[in-house]
Protein backbone atom coordinates (compact mmCIF):
# COMPACT_ATOMS: atom_id res chain seq x y z
CA UNK A 1 0.00 0.00 0.00
CA UNK A 2 1.07 3.60 -0.55
CA UNK A 3 0.53 5.88 2.43
CA UNK A 4 -2.36 8.32 2.05
CA UNK A 5 -3.20 6.97 -1.43
CA UNK A 6 -5.68 4.31 -2.49
CA UNK A 7 -4.22 2.53 -5.51
CA UNK A 8 -6.60 0.75 -7.87
CA UNK A 9 -5.49 -1.35 -10.84
CA UNK A 10 -7.93 -1.54 -13.76
CA UNK A 11 -7.82 -4.27 -16.38
CA UNK A 12 -9.76 -3.60 -19.61
CA UNK A 13 -10.36 -7.18 -20.74
CA UNK A 14 -11.55 -8.73 -23.99
CA UNK A 15 -11.01 -12.43 -24.67
CA UNK A 16 -8.30 -12.57 -22.00
CA UNK A 17 -8.98 -16.06 -20.64
CA UNK A 18 -5.49 -17.33 -21.51
CA UNK A 19 -3.55 -14.46 -19.93
CA UNK A 20 -5.68 -12.89 -17.19
CA UNK A 21 -4.60 -15.21 -14.38
CA UNK A 22 -0.89 -14.82 -15.19
CA UNK A 23 -1.28 -11.05 -15.26
CA UNK A 24 -3.11 -10.87 -11.94
CA UNK A 25 -0.65 -13.25 -10.26
CA UNK A 26 2.20 -10.77 -10.80
CA UNK A 27 0.39 -7.63 -9.63
CA UNK A 28 2.09 -6.49 -6.38
CA UNK A 29 -0.60 -6.82 -3.70
CA UNK A 30 1.47 -4.83 -1.22
CA UNK A 31 0.91 -1.79 -3.45
CA UNK A 32 -2.56 -2.31 -4.92
CA UNK A 33 -5.65 -1.84 -2.77
CA UNK A 34 -8.13 -3.17 -5.31
CA UNK A 35 -8.28 -4.65 -8.81
CA UNK A 36 -11.13 -4.01 -11.24
CA UNK A 37 -11.62 -6.13 -14.35
CA UNK A 38 -14.01 -4.76 -16.96
CA UNK A 39 -15.01 -7.37 -19.54
CA UNK A 40 -16.09 -5.99 -22.90
CA UNK A 41 -18.60 -8.72 -23.82
CA UNK A 42 -16.03 -11.49 -24.26
CA UNK A 43 -17.25 -14.81 -25.63
CA UNK A 44 -14.70 -16.86 -23.71
CA UNK A 45 -14.18 -17.58 -19.99
CA UNK A 46 -12.67 -14.20 -19.06
CA UNK A 47 -15.53 -13.30 -16.70
CA UNK A 48 -15.51 -16.66 -14.92
CA UNK A 49 -11.76 -16.44 -14.37
CA UNK A 50 -11.96 -12.84 -13.11
CA UNK A 51 -14.63 -13.80 -10.59
CA UNK A 52 -12.69 -16.86 -9.48
CA UNK A 53 -9.67 -14.64 -8.84
CA UNK A 54 -11.79 -12.41 -6.61
CA UNK A 55 -11.56 -9.32 -8.81
CA UNK A 56 -14.20 -6.63 -8.85
CA UNK A 57 -15.75 -7.67 -12.14
CA UNK A 58 -17.84 -5.45 -14.40
CA UNK A 59 -19.38 -7.03 -17.50
CA UNK A 60 -20.59 -5.11 -20.56
CA UNK A 61 -23.66 -6.70 -22.13
CA UNK A 62 -22.40 -5.54 -25.53
CA UNK A 63 -18.98 -4.66 -26.88
CA UNK A 64 -18.22 -0.97 -26.31
CA UNK A 65 -14.72 -0.97 -27.78
CA UNK A 66 -11.31 -0.42 -26.23
CA UNK A 67 -11.96 3.19 -25.31
CA UNK A 68 -15.44 2.42 -24.05
CA UNK A 69 -13.98 -0.28 -21.82
CA UNK A 70 -11.49 2.15 -20.29
CA UNK A 71 -14.22 4.69 -19.60
CA UNK A 72 -15.97 2.10 -17.45
CA UNK A 73 -12.66 1.19 -15.79
CA UNK A 74 -11.95 4.75 -14.69
CA UNK A 75 -15.52 5.48 -13.65
CA UNK A 76 -15.59 2.40 -11.44
CA UNK A 77 -12.16 3.15 -9.95
CA UNK A 78 -13.21 6.66 -8.99
CA UNK A 79 -16.47 5.36 -7.53
CA UNK A 80 -14.54 3.27 -4.97
CA UNK A 81 -12.33 6.18 -3.94
CA UNK A 82 -9.18 5.63 -6.00
CA UNK A 83 -6.46 8.26 -5.63
CA UNK A 84 -4.10 6.58 -8.12
CA UNK A 85 -5.40 4.45 -11.00
CA UNK A 86 -3.10 2.16 -12.97
CA UNK A 87 -4.41 0.78 -16.25
CA UNK A 88 -2.78 -2.49 -17.34
CA UNK A 89 -3.68 -4.61 -20.35
CA UNK A 90 -4.49 -8.11 -19.04
CA UNK A 91 -2.85 -9.81 -22.03
CA UNK A 92 0.44 -10.33 -20.15
CA UNK A 93 2.31 -8.24 -22.70
CA UNK A 94 3.52 -5.77 -20.05
CA UNK A 95 5.21 -6.69 -16.77
CA UNK A 96 2.68 -6.36 -13.92
CA UNK A 97 5.59 -6.22 -11.45
CA UNK A 98 6.27 -2.63 -12.53
CA UNK A 99 2.85 -1.47 -11.37
CA UNK A 100 4.33 -0.36 -8.06
CA UNK A 101 6.96 1.76 -9.81
CA UNK A 102 4.30 3.54 -11.85
CA UNK A 103 2.14 4.15 -8.79
CA UNK A 104 5.12 5.48 -6.83
CA UNK A 105 5.89 7.96 -9.61
CA UNK A 106 2.41 9.38 -9.15
CA UNK A 107 2.59 9.27 -5.35
CA UNK A 108 5.85 11.25 -5.43
CA UNK A 109 3.89 14.30 -6.53
CA UNK A 110 6.22 14.95 -9.46
CA UNK A 111 3.95 13.45 -12.12
CA UNK A 112 0.24 13.40 -12.87
CA UNK A 113 0.58 10.60 -15.43
CA UNK A 114 3.17 7.82 -15.64
CA UNK A 115 3.70 5.61 -18.69
CA UNK A 116 5.37 2.23 -19.04
CA UNK A 117 7.39 2.66 -22.24
CA UNK A 118 8.34 -0.23 -24.50
CA UNK A 119 10.81 2.00 -26.32
CA UNK A 120 13.04 3.48 -23.59
CA UNK A 121 14.86 0.19 -22.97
CA UNK A 122 14.67 -0.81 -26.65
CA UNK A 123 12.72 -3.88 -25.58
CA UNK A 124 9.93 -3.69 -28.15
CA UNK A 125 11.71 -5.44 -31.03
CA UNK A 126 13.55 -7.78 -28.67
CA UNK A 127 10.20 -8.73 -27.16
CA UNK A 128 8.76 -9.60 -30.56
CA UNK A 129 7.01 -6.44 -31.74
CA UNK A 130 6.50 -6.71 -35.53
CA UNK A 131 8.91 -4.42 -37.38
CA UNK A 132 6.14 -2.54 -39.21
CA UNK A 133 4.45 -1.74 -35.90
CA UNK A 134 7.71 -0.56 -34.39
CA UNK A 135 8.40 1.75 -37.34
CA UNK A 136 4.85 3.09 -37.22
CA UNK A 137 5.11 3.61 -33.45
CA UNK A 138 8.33 5.57 -33.77
CA UNK A 139 7.09 7.62 -36.71
CA UNK A 140 3.82 8.57 -35.04
CA UNK A 141 5.64 9.44 -31.83
CA UNK A 142 8.02 11.81 -33.62
CA UNK A 143 5.13 13.64 -35.26
CA UNK A 144 3.11 13.79 -32.04
CA UNK A 145 6.06 15.19 -30.10
CA UNK A 146 6.58 17.89 -32.71
CA UNK A 147 2.90 18.83 -32.75
CA UNK A 148 2.15 18.92 -29.03
CA UNK A 149 5.60 19.92 -27.79
CA UNK A 150 6.56 16.86 -25.76
CA UNK A 151 9.56 14.51 -25.68
CA UNK A 152 7.86 11.21 -24.88
CA UNK A 153 9.34 7.95 -26.13
CA UNK A 154 5.89 6.64 -27.09
CA UNK A 155 2.17 7.44 -26.83
CA UNK A 156 0.83 3.98 -27.55
CA UNK A 157 1.58 1.93 -24.45
CA UNK A 158 -1.12 -0.05 -22.66
CA UNK A 159 0.44 0.57 -19.24
CA UNK A 160 -0.50 3.90 -17.64
CA UNK A 161 -1.03 5.47 -14.22
CA UNK A 162 -3.13 8.54 -13.46
CA UNK A 163 -3.94 10.78 -10.54
CA UNK A 164 -7.54 11.15 -9.55
CA UNK A 165 -7.42 14.79 -10.67
CA UNK A 166 -6.47 13.81 -14.22
CA UNK A 167 -9.39 11.40 -14.55
CA UNK A 168 -11.84 13.89 -13.09
CA UNK A 169 -10.58 16.75 -15.28
CA UNK A 170 -10.51 15.13 -18.71
CA UNK A 171 -13.78 14.92 -20.70
CA UNK A 172 -13.48 11.15 -21.08
CA UNK A 173 -17.08 10.69 -22.22
CA UNK A 174 -16.37 12.79 -25.33
CA UNK A 175 -13.39 10.69 -26.42
CA UNK A 176 -13.45 7.84 -28.93
CA UNK A 177 -14.55 4.35 -27.93
CA UNK A 178 -11.83 2.93 -30.18
CA UNK A 179 -8.05 2.63 -29.77
CA UNK A 180 -7.35 6.32 -30.38
CA UNK A 181 -8.86 6.94 -26.92
CA UNK A 182 -5.37 6.52 -25.41
CA UNK A 183 -3.95 9.34 -27.50
CA UNK A 184 -6.91 11.60 -26.89
CA UNK A 185 -6.30 11.21 -23.15
CA UNK A 186 -2.62 12.11 -23.37
CA UNK A 187 -3.07 15.02 -25.76
CA UNK A 188 -5.88 16.46 -23.64
CA UNK A 189 -3.75 16.04 -20.51
CA UNK A 190 -0.80 17.86 -22.09
CA UNK A 191 -3.06 20.70 -23.16
CA UNK A 192 -4.17 21.07 -19.53
CA UNK A 193 -0.61 21.18 -18.27
CA UNK A 194 -0.47 17.79 -16.54
CA UNK A 195 3.05 16.40 -16.06
CA UNK A 196 3.88 13.08 -17.74
CA UNK A 197 6.74 10.76 -16.78
CA UNK A 198 7.95 7.44 -18.17
CA UNK A 199 9.71 4.28 -17.06
CA UNK A 200 11.09 1.55 -19.29
CA UNK A 201 8.98 -1.59 -19.46
CA UNK A 202 9.97 -4.90 -21.07
CA UNK A 203 7.23 -6.38 -23.23
CA UNK A 204 6.30 -9.76 -24.66
CA UNK A 205 4.63 -10.48 -27.99
CA UNK A 206 3.09 -13.92 -28.40
CA UNK A 207 -0.02 -15.54 -29.88
CA UNK A 208 -2.31 -14.73 -26.96
CA UNK A 209 -1.23 -11.07 -26.65
CA UNK A 210 -3.85 -8.66 -27.94
CA UNK A 211 -3.24 -6.84 -31.19
CA UNK A 212 -5.08 -5.13 -34.03
CA UNK A 213 -4.94 -5.95 -37.72
CA UNK A 214 -3.24 -3.86 -40.40
CA UNK A 215 -6.42 -2.12 -41.55
CA UNK A 216 -7.33 -1.00 -38.03
CA UNK A 217 -3.71 0.00 -37.46
CA UNK A 218 -3.92 2.39 -40.42
CA UNK A 219 -7.18 3.85 -39.13
CA UNK A 220 -5.62 4.19 -35.71
CA UNK A 221 -2.59 6.00 -37.12
CA UNK A 222 -4.75 8.52 -38.94
CA UNK A 223 -6.77 9.07 -35.78
CA UNK A 224 -3.59 9.65 -33.79
CA UNK A 225 -2.36 12.30 -36.23
CA UNK A 226 -5.73 14.02 -36.23
CA UNK A 227 -5.81 14.09 -32.44
CA UNK A 228 -2.31 15.55 -32.22
CA UNK A 229 -3.20 18.24 -34.76
CA UNK A 230 -6.33 19.21 -32.82
CA UNK A 231 -4.23 19.60 -29.67
CA UNK A 232 -1.13 21.16 -31.24
CA UNK A 233 1.09 23.26 -29.00
CA UNK A 234 0.09 26.56 -30.60
CA UNK A 235 -3.51 26.05 -29.54
CA UNK A 236 -4.61 27.67 -26.26
CA UNK A 237 -4.21 25.80 -22.99
CA UNK A 238 -7.35 24.42 -21.39
CA UNK A 239 -8.32 24.77 -17.72
CA UNK A 240 -8.29 21.84 -15.30
CA UNK A 241 -11.99 21.91 -14.55
CA UNK A 242 -13.60 18.84 -13.10
CA UNK A 243 -16.06 17.57 -15.66
CA UNK A 244 -17.58 14.80 -13.53
CA UNK A 245 -20.91 15.98 -12.08
CA UNK A 246 -20.60 16.72 -8.36
CA UNK A 247 -23.31 14.24 -7.43
CA UNK A 248 -21.37 11.45 -9.18
CA UNK A 249 -17.99 12.42 -7.73
CA UNK A 250 -17.09 10.22 -4.76
CA UNK A 251 -14.76 11.66 -2.09
CA UNK A 252 -11.08 10.79 -2.30
CA UNK A 253 -10.08 8.05 0.07
CA UNK A 254 -8.76 8.60 3.56
CA UNK A 255 -5.94 6.43 4.92
CA UNK A 256 -8.12 4.99 7.68
CA UNK A 257 -10.76 3.90 5.20
CA UNK A 258 -8.41 2.05 2.87
CA UNK A 259 -9.68 -1.41 1.97
CA UNK A 260 -7.30 -4.22 1.22
CA UNK A 261 -7.39 -6.28 -1.97
CA UNK A 262 -9.88 -9.09 -1.79
CA UNK A 263 -8.32 -12.56 -2.08
Regions found by a protein language model. Name each.
Residues 1-3, 149, 173-263:
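Hydrophobic helical membrane-anchoring modules
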Residues 60-79, 84, 96-179, 206-215, ...:
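Acceptor/aglycone-binding surface of glycosyltransferases and processive sugar-polymer synthases
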Residues 41, 65, 93:
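A short, conserved beta-strand element in the Rossmann-like catalytic core
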Residues 14-29:
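Short, well-formed alpha-helical segments that are part of the catalytic scaffolds
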Residues 39-47:
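A conserved acidic beta->alpha catalytic loop
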Residues 8-12, 59:
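Short hydrophobic beta-strand elements that form part
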Residues 16-19, 42, 95:
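Donor nucleotide-sugar binding loop of glycosyltransferases
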Amino acid sequence: MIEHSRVVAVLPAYHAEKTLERTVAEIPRDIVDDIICVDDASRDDTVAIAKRLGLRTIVHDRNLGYGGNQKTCYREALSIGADIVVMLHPDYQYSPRLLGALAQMIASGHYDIALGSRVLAQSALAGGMPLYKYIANRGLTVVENLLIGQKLSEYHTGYRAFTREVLESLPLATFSNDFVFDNEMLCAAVRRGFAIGEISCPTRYFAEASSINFRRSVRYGLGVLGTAWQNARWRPRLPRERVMPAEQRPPASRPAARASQRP
